A protein has these predicted regions:
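Structured beta-strand/turn binding interfaces of compact recognition modules in eukaryotic regulators
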Residues: 57, 126, 136
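Amphipathic, interaction-prone secondary-structure segments
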Residues: 25-51, 108-128
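Intrinsic disorder/low-complexity detector
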Residues: 1-29, 48, 54-110, 139-174
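Conserved catalytic cores of phosphodiester-cleaving nucleases, focusing on short active-site segments
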Residues: 133
């Protein structure tokens, strides 16, 4: 699976998830493969003006799988993005993806309560391609809330139907 194909799926899923804190979703980067000067990714803008990004990185051979855990507070945007993405994938079960897991990358992040923080999502595709999608974040012009402003958010059922929106044939001119 190509990086762009995986990012197409992720972008469609973020849009279908309709999270109320996400105000804009944009693609960026020109690289077709991880490791270049312009990594391909998706940037999500939040109500606070901060952003979180999921981008294709070269997999680290010592990346350590981590359990999903609880949703972290808004100030940890990169971590929230990873947890939200995992939760969305759990609901959507996209056919091209065989499995996904959070990973800690050696030398990235810190230790929280004796455990490393996640820094990436490892996706194993059905064609045996392994994608390593790193998460990073930027600050916004407003302070992040201390607690989740949308604690009752549930991933909508429409996420299960994402593939119908992405792969449906166009009703072009005949």
């Amino acid at each position: 699976m190509q990086v762009s194909q995986a990012l197409d799926i992720m972008e469609a899923l973020y849009r279908a998830a309709e999270h109320p804190d996400i105000t804009e979703i944009k693609r960026y980067g020109r690289d077709a493969e991880p490791g270049g000067q312009s990594p391909a990714g998706i940037r999500l803008w939040h109500e606070s003006g901060s952003s979180s990004m999921l981008w294709a990185a070269v997999p680290h051979r010592d990346a350590q799988p981590l359990p999903l855990g609880e949703m972290p507070p808004p100030r940890l945007r990169f971590w929230r993005l990873l947890v939200l993405t995992h939760q969305i994938l759990d609901v959507a079960q996209p056919e091209p993806f065989a499995s996904w897991e959070l990973c800690a990358t050696p030398g990235v992040g810190w230790t929280e309560n004796g455990h490393p923080t996640p820094s990436a999502l490892r996706i194993t595709c059905r064609d045996r391609t392994v994608l390593h999608l790193r998460a990073t974040a930027t600050s916004g012009d407003r302070r992040e809330p201390e607690t989740d402003p949308y604690p009752d958010y549930q991933i909508p059922e429409g996420v299960r139907e994402w593939h119908h929106k992405v792969s449906a044939p166009s009703a072009g001119h005949v």
